Amino acid sequence: MSKFKSLLLLFGTLILLSGCSNIEIFNAKGPVASSQKFLILYSIVFMLVICFVVLGMFAIFIYKYSYNKNAESGKMHHNAIIETIWFVIPIIIVAALAIPTVKTLYDYEKPPKSEKDPMVVYAVSAGYKWFFAYPDEHIETVNTLTIPKDRPVVFKLQAMDTMTSFWIPQLGGQKYAMTGMTMNWTLEASQTGTFRGRNSNFNGEGFSRQTFKVNAVSQKDYDKWVKEVKGKKTLDQDTFDKQLLPSTPNKALEFNGTHMAFVDPAADPEYIFYAYKRFNFELKDPNFTSEENMFKDVSEKPLIPARKAQITNANYKRHGMKLMILGNDEPYNNEFKKDESKNAKEMKKISKDAQDQDNDDHGGGH
């Protein structure tokens, strides 16, 4: 009995200790995360109420209708009222859970309401790192992100190698970043602070280290930070290509200029393989390669010249989509944004056509 009490005490202690952890999705710091928090709590409470009612009725029926010697065997007969109740109640339950869920999910696709114009950040995943290009400011960061408080941020998500998932739990849910396309995801920080971001989609041995730090600051501090970064080293193609290698250590870096001056990852998904070639990097299976041999042949300096911007995405050529290159001395203006928007519309059309074709192939509806 004492052993049972010890195990019970240990189990109870573990439950209490779990309450000391910082559950980030319940510590919302933005409007999108707040709506997600409400939806999660609403669903949990709603389902707990259902469980308590069902278990309570179960206990009552067991007690009231338990078998005894004087019990008369039950008689089955039709009861329209009861049958209507147990048919209608599940429909109400499903509707009560589905309506707010669907509404919230569709709301996520719309930018949070704000009096301030949204800013744009290109978030690119590659080499188990995150690259953040600020086209308006012409600066770029690696594994660190700084944004102003109370201003929507439109993240244009791209991947240069494996598919990843961009996630800042305290600001909102995750969204996938895929090769050969650009996905938009709008988030906003309603408070200043430092938050954690990560790739939430398992994509290989470096998955655990593909994280980044998010600094939400006042607009004044943000402007000051931008000015400081503009005074740092300009990002050149050799430096960027070296950072694309999984063998390059994950560090928080800041640069003047962006990779948008020499590559459009969505239009040129083959770019990263040329970067590998420049530094003699070869992907190896970590299960069959010793740690010291994983990256031993990688060159410190590029062995061949950098490649010019080009289109290797067949969809771009087929649909007349433009290569989006923004020089460090070129403005991120309406003309550039118009081409961005056109590419995005074509990409949505391609995605819809692919879904329709898949439905036709599998006998599904539209």
UniProtKB/Swiss-Prot annotation:
<keyword id="KW-0812">Transmembrane</keyword>
<keyword id="KW-0679">Respiratory chain</keyword>
<dbReference type="InterPro" id="IPR008972">
    <property type="entry name" value="Cupredoxin"/>
</dbReference>
<dbReference type="GO" id="GO:0016682">
    <property type="term" value="F:oxidoreductase activity, acting on diphenols and related substances as donors, oxygen as acceptor"/>
</dbReference>
<dbReference type="InterPro" id="IPR045187">
    <property type="entry name" value="CcO_II"/>
</dbReference>
<feature type="lipid moiety-binding region" description="N-palmitoyl cysteine">
    <location>
        <position position="20"/>
    </location>
</feature>
<keyword id="KW-0249">Electron transport</keyword>
<protein>
    <recommendedName>
        <fullName>Probable quinol oxidase subunit 2</fullName>
        <ecNumber>1.10.3.-</ecNumber>
    </recommendedName>
</protein>
<dbReference type="InterPro" id="IPR002429">
    <property type="entry name" value="CcO_II-like_C"/>
</dbReference>
<keyword id="KW-0813">Transport</keyword>
<feature type="transmembrane region" description="Helical">
    <location>
        <begin position="80"/>
        <end position="100"/>
    </location>
</feature>
<feature type="transmembrane region" description="Helical">
    <location>
        <begin position="38"/>
        <end position="58"/>
    </location>
</feature>
<keyword id="KW-0732">Signal</keyword>
<keyword id="KW-0472">Membrane</keyword>
<dbReference type="GO" id="GO:0004129">
    <property type="term" value="F:cytochrome-c oxidase activity"/>
</dbReference>
<dbReference type="InterPro" id="IPR011759">
    <property type="entry name" value="Cyt_c_oxidase_su2_TM_dom"/>
</dbReference>
<dbReference type="GO" id="GO:0009486">
    <property type="term" value="F:cytochrome bo3 ubiquinol oxidase activity"/>
</dbReference>
<feature type="lipid moiety-binding region" description="S-diacylglycerol cysteine">
    <location>
        <position position="20"/>
    </location>
</feature>
<dbReference type="GO" id="GO:0042773">
    <property type="term" value="P:ATP synthesis coupled electron transport"/>
</dbReference>
<feature type="compositionally biased region" description="Basic and acidic residues">
    <location>
        <begin position="335"/>
        <end position="366"/>
    </location>
</feature>
<dbReference type="InterPro" id="IPR036257">
    <property type="entry name" value="Cyt_c_oxidase_su2_TM_sf"/>
</dbReference>
<dbReference type="Pfam" id="PF02790">
    <property type="entry name" value="COX2_TM"/>
</dbReference>
<keyword id="KW-1133">Transmembrane helix</keyword>
<feature type="region of interest" description="Disordered">
    <location>
        <begin position="330"/>
        <end position="366"/>
    </location>
</feature>
<keyword id="KW-0449">Lipoprotein</keyword>
<dbReference type="InterPro" id="IPR034227">
    <property type="entry name" value="CuRO_UO_II"/>
</dbReference>
<feature type="signal peptide">
    <location>
        <begin position="1"/>
        <end position="19"/>
    </location>
</feature>
<comment type="function">
    <text>Catalyzes quinol oxidation with the concomitant reduction of oxygen to water. Subunit II transfers the electrons from a quinol to the binuclear center of the catalytic subunit I.</text>
</comment>
<dbReference type="InterPro" id="IPR006332">
    <property type="entry name" value="QoxA"/>
</dbReference>
<dbReference type="GO" id="GO:0005886">
    <property type="term" value="C:plasma membrane"/>
</dbReference>
<keyword id="KW-0564">Palmitate</keyword>
<dbReference type="GO" id="GO:0005507">
    <property type="term" value="F:copper ion binding"/>
</dbReference>
<keyword id="KW-0560">Oxidoreductase</keyword>
<comment type="similarity">
    <text>Belongs to the cytochrome c oxidase subunit 2 family.</text>
</comment>
<keyword id="KW-1003">Cell membrane</keyword>
